[in-house]
Regions:
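Gly/Ala-rich beta-loop-alpha elbow adjacent to hydrolase catalytic centers
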Residues: 142-147, 151
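Serine hydrolase/lipase
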Residues: 77-80, 135, 160-261
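Long, non-catalytic terminal segments
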Residues: 1-64
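A conserved cap/lid and substrate-binding interface adjacent to the catalytic center
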Residues: 40-140, 161, 168-170, 175-177
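A short acidic (Asp/Glu
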Residues: 150-154, 173-176
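Short, surface-exposed basic-aromatic patches at helix termini and helix-loop junctions that form
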Residues: 153-161
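Cys-dependent protein tyrosine phosphatase-like superfamily
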Residues: 1-12, 16, 65-68, 79, ...
Length: 261
């Protein structure tokens, strides 16, 4: 067994990097995220059934000073993990009312105006630690809103696979640093590894996006609903896209924004 202390803040080995792969249907991600942070399972330890996986909360990471927050979800049957990076706090609802909101806005503005994102080093440590864990056989990333910056960064730096929505993009300087001298190759790998779910009316993305959208963009139906930059609107749109794709109207009793199966 691997000593857990050896997993902290280290350079991933080739065997660890080989764990990076995609397994989840990207359209299931907004519903999963909404249930995890804002839905009926937000205060529950119950596992979530998504696309044949039973994902339980394996580990939580929360760094109040930088605002970094999220979960490592794990399917015990396969060892596949989803590392979910949380988006911006909501006023009156989360982490100290407005305090968390101001922390998050500070991080977004710092990233947008070139003074750096203080969450990135913390996220880097959390990700490399997860890669090292023996229980984690494979892993992919999920990022919403400001969490999308982190997922984009880790995908470009390490070759991780990710699904992002409410996508804030990636700072051009970070893309250049981790492109290893070949921007076009880095952009191609990012398009191959990142799916970016988009609602055309998301004004927060337009106002606070920090840089280039590096993933392959999938435009969801009902784009104007995105003006409120809420994960539930993305979940509704993604569920509609699933029904359109699969040629069904949805099951009786289907709950708006649910992760699905």
């Amino acid at each position: 067994a691997v000593d857990s202390s050896a997993c902290r803040a280290h350079e991933p080995t080739p065997l660890e990097l080989a764990k990076q792969r995609s397994a989840i249907d990207p359209l299931r991600v907004p519903g999963l995220y909404s249930e995890l942070f804002h839905g009926r399972l937000s205060d529950s330890s119950a596992a979530m059934s998504v696309g044949g996986m039973r994902l339980r909360r394996h580990k939580q990471f929360d760094h109040t000073d930088s605002g970094l927050s999220g979960f490592v979800l794990l399917d015990d049957a396969t060892g596949h993990a989803l590392m979910v990076f949380k988006g911006m706090d909501r006023p009156f609802a989360e982490r100290g009312s407005w305090a968390g909101v101001f922390t998050d806005l500070g991080v977004v503005l710092a990233a947008k105006f070139g003074t750096g994102n203080s969450q990135l080093p913390r996220a880097d440590d959390a990700y490399t630690e997860a890669l090292c864990e023996e229980a984690v056989k494979s892993i992919e990333l999920v990022g919403y809103s400001m969490g999308s910056q982190i997922a984009n960064y880790l995908a470009v730096k390490y070759g991780a696979h990710a699904v992002v929505f409410g996508d804030m993009g990636l700072d051009a300087a970070l893309l250049k640093i981790h492109a290893r001298g070949n921007l076009e190759a880095a952009r191609k790998e990012a398009r191959d590894h990142i799916v970016s779910l988009s609602l055309s009316g998301d004004l927060v993305v337009k106002a606070f996006g920090v840089g280039e959208v590096v993933g392959t963009v999938v435009n969801l139906p009902g784009g104007l609903n995105g003006v409120f930059h809420q994960p539930e609107f993305y979940a509704d749109a993604a569920n509609a896209a699933i029904r359109n794709r699969d040629g069904v109207r949805g099951r009786d009793g289907e709950r708006t924004g649910q992760a699905g199966t």
